[in-house]
Amino acid sequence: MKHIVKHIHFVGIGGAGMSGIAEVLVNLGYQVSGSDLARNAVTERLEALGARVSIGHDAANIEGANAVVVSTAVRSDNPEVLAARRLRVPIVPRAVMLAELMRLKQGIAIAGTHGKTTTTSLVASVLAAGGLDPTFVIGGRLTSAGANARLGTGDFIVAEADESDASFLNLYPVIEVITNIDADHMDTYGHDFARLKQAFIEFTQRLPFYGSAVVCIDDANVRQIVPLISKPVVRYGFAADAQVRAENVEARDGRMHFTVRREGREPLPVVLNLPGLHNVQNALAAIAIATDLDVADAAIQQALAEFNGVGRRFQRYGEIAAAGGGAYTLIDDYGHHPVEMAATIAAARGAFPGRRLVLAFQPHRYTRTRDCFDDFVNVLSTVDALVLTEVYAAGEAPISTANGDALSRALRAAGKVEPVFVATVDEVPDALAKLARDGDVVITMGAGSIGGVPGKLAQDTQQKG
């Protein structure tokens, strides 16, 4: 590719999905430029690596580019996209560029409605511990690497495969993981769940004859499609028919302790440095792949015991000063679908038994709030105290029956928790100051701008200290 394409421009280079690909391309020796609406830690890292980052979108930003990479979040009337069309510069979807990277190595693609980022991080960490030095592109910052991407010297590239826009069908990996299949991003599939499941079946058809689909057999929808997968299947989970199975699971001190049973292998005791049954399942996917690639059991155990997590996935910020004295434990999480939220809340209950759980939640997208409205009410009703913000629109038009006020009214009617509604995330710290008490566990949650709140709370505590 490099003899034809030397300069690659990214529209929205600071995004989680775009920045990782950009970083790998920089490290491969390409000239990389990009634009975004604001500087952040990601854009600063890319600039330090040698990328040219412009703030704001302008036609002049693509000057000299041989290709312009876009995600589905980039509008067709973006000035850089219009300029690329006018100049006949190829416009490349993000997933197509990821597919090109996968052609350079053997791809391991992690798909599923929930758990992709954590599972991708676990797979990359276990393979690294096994000496395979993988390249990885992750939708969150892997704490141990200090980045969401890395160019390794090994044969494998580990990456998330995004079903939200069906772009995972551009990928042709040699190993695939399917963590679960749930109703999300249904606009892409015409609100037809059968079409969503069919897309996952088509995803497995991208595998070569020597490839394998590593699937969570605990998920009912995944189980339904297994008979329709024509390539070799490895089942993992808690179910009796899982080929890589977790037994004797215990939660202790924020970690999960369990034994892994694998066909033809000795039982493997594991300590996972993450809470929650869902993370045990995520770890089983990594164990299944590592076992297939002959990673030593000791390396698997070490990687999982020392796993430091990934940004915004049950990320612990430590103890934060409570307004009334004492301190509360602060955790930040990217969860934005009721199933993800329930798993995180259950993990918090298991990690911190008997402690009051306070949630600050920013709903993400009006359409998701509308489509999962009752499920949101149910899961939000399981916490002890709740701060609720207005919906993060993500470019969508407001829906009056699925906004923060409507959700607050429904929660009050359900009668299990009294929500404190705030219009913006800027009001969340003050709301938590009035609500959070010594000994509480506070979780900030959502896929939108609420991700900036925990850093502010931690900074305020440091300044007071």
UniProtKB/Swiss-Prot annotation:
<feature type="binding site">
    <location>
        <begin position="112"/>
        <end position="118"/>
    </location>
    <ligand>
        <name>ATP</name>
    </ligand>
</feature>
<comment type="pathway">
    <text>Cell wall biogenesis; peptidoglycan biosynthesis.</text>
</comment>
<keyword id="KW-0547">Nucleotide-binding</keyword>
<dbReference type="InterPro" id="IPR050061">
    <property type="entry name" value="MurCDEF_pg_biosynth"/>
</dbReference>
<dbReference type="Pfam" id="PF08245">
    <property type="entry name" value="Mur_ligase_M"/>
</dbReference>
<dbReference type="Pfam" id="PF02875">
    <property type="entry name" value="Mur_ligase_C"/>
</dbReference>
<dbReference type="InterPro" id="IPR036565">
    <property type="entry name" value="Mur-like_cat_sf"/>
</dbReference>
<dbReference type="GO" id="GO:0009252">
    <property type="term" value="P:peptidoglycan biosynthetic process"/>
</dbReference>
<dbReference type="GO" id="GO:0005524">
    <property type="term" value="F:ATP binding"/>
</dbReference>
<dbReference type="InterPro" id="IPR013221">
    <property type="entry name" value="Mur_ligase_cen"/>
</dbReference>
<keyword id="KW-0961">Cell wall biogenesis/degradation</keyword>
<keyword id="KW-0436">Ligase</keyword>
<dbReference type="InterPro" id="IPR036615">
    <property type="entry name" value="Mur_ligase_C_dom_sf"/>
</dbReference>
<comment type="function">
    <text>Cell wall formation.</text>
</comment>
<keyword id="KW-0131">Cell cycle</keyword>
<dbReference type="GO" id="GO:0008360">
    <property type="term" value="P:regulation of cell shape"/>
</dbReference>
<dbReference type="InterPro" id="IPR000713">
    <property type="entry name" value="Mur_ligase_N"/>
</dbReference>
<dbReference type="GO" id="GO:0008763">
    <property type="term" value="F:UDP-N-acetylmuramate-L-alanine ligase activity"/>
</dbReference>
<keyword id="KW-0133">Cell shape</keyword>
<protein>
    <recommendedName>
        <fullName>UDP-N-acetylmuramate--L-alanine ligase</fullName>
        <ecNumber>6.3.2.8</ecNumber>
    </recommendedName>
</protein>
<keyword id="KW-0132">Cell division</keyword>
<dbReference type="GO" id="GO:0005737">
    <property type="term" value="C:cytoplasm"/>
</dbReference>
<dbReference type="GO" id="GO:0051301">
    <property type="term" value="P:cell division"/>
</dbReference>
<comment type="similarity">
    <text>Belongs to the MurCDEF family.</text>
</comment>
<dbReference type="InterPro" id="IPR005758">
    <property type="entry name" value="UDP-N-AcMur_Ala_ligase_MurC"/>
</dbReference>
<keyword id="KW-0963">Cytoplasm</keyword>
<dbReference type="GO" id="GO:0071555">
    <property type="term" value="P:cell wall organization"/>
</dbReference>
<keyword id="KW-0573">Peptidoglycan synthesis</keyword>
<dbReference type="InterPro" id="IPR004101">
    <property type="entry name" value="Mur_ligase_C"/>
</dbReference>
<keyword id="KW-0067">ATP-binding</keyword>
<dbReference type="Pfam" id="PF01225">
    <property type="entry name" value="Mur_ligase"/>
</dbReference>
